[in-house]
Amino acid sequence: TFEDAIKSELKRIEICKNNPEYKINNNDFNNHAVFSYLRHGIYVDFIKAWMKFFTKEQFLILPTYELNNNRKKFLKQVFDYLNVQNFEIKDVERQNVGEYKKLDKSMRKFLVDYYRPHNERLFKLLEKNFDWDK
């Protein structure tokens, strides 16, 4: 499960932190960082890396819940940003929708707390707030 994967990752992180054989340049630690579930959710670091090459104005960052809640408004924002004519996309049915077990409340709280400082940095960078903790 997702919860099991996160718990296993936290154990690996603790082993890496507490074992003197693991240094930051250790390949196992670096591989962990590359394949980390948690690290991939720290969007601010990835966006900052891209902003070394592109200006802030060259990014349009929108939450997917806006796409799900109001597809026409969402697409209008995208078309306006791209300076292209607004048009209606006919086939907007969601494809390959999976079934997911509801996230355990304690795991959700952990994730909200874990990502809070990173998301605050993101919101400050983007000058925009997303309601991810609700």
Regions found by a protein language model. Name each.
Residues T1-E66, N70-K73, Q77:
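PAPS-dependent sulfotransferase catalytic domain
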Residues L38, K48-R121, E127, D131-K134:
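The conserved 3'-phosphoadenosine-5'-phosphosulfate
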